[in-house]
């Protein structure tokens, strides 16, 4: 038994420090709630509150990257800032995805319904966040995000995949 304990101890010493998968997923879910209030019961009362919430999410991303040993050589300040600079265009792609799902599914009653309830929208949206981090060279975190979406939706999209709008339409037909 002593060899077994020693083996487990050595494995634990070799584990790379990083936030838990749950904390990483919670960051993405929180960001989704900011982007799409349809997915959340919390609303903000001023533009300043929204701006502060996005700044907090950026700080949370920075801290998450800082706590990730595999990111020790990354320029985490630049990556965090670039992610949030690119967020408006990521958001626009997410809206385009939601519209494509709605247009491709005759059962969809509204954009609100697609955003709030469709697993395909959640999977693609989390992928969009993960892909931005993947593109910036962040290790492991993008895959954790897409695996979170996979666990919630059954839809597995690699964070490095390149999705075109035709993919969204085809996916709607398959789902």
Q: Where in this protein do the model-derived segments appear?
A:
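Terminal amphipathic alpha-helical/low-complexity segments used for targeting or macromolecular assembly
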Residues: 1-147
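Structural signal for interior beta-strand "rungs" in well-ordered beta-sheet cores
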Residues: 149-175
């Amino acid at each position: 038994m002593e060899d077994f304990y020693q083996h487990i101890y050595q494995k634990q010493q070799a584990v790379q420090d990083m936030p838990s998968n749950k904390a990483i997923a919670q960051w993405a879910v929180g960001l989704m709630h900011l982007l799409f209030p349809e997915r959340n019961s919390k609303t903000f009362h001023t533009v300043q509150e929204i701006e502060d919430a996005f700044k907090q999410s950026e700080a949370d991303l920075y801290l998450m990257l800082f706590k990730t040993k595999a990111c020790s050589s990354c320029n985490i300040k630049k990556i965090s800032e670039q992610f949030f600079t690119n967020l408006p265009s990521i958001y626009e792609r997410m809206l385009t995805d939601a519209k494509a799902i709605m247009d491709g599914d005759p059962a969809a009653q509204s954009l609100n319904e697609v955003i709030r309830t469709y697993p395909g929208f959640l999977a693609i949206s989390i992928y969009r966040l993960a892909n931005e981090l993947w593109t910036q060279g962040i290790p492991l975190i993008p895959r954790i995000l897409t695996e979170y979406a996979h666990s919630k939706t059954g839809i597995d999209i690699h964070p490095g995949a390149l999705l075109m709008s035709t993919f969204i339409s085809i996916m709607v037909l398959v789902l």
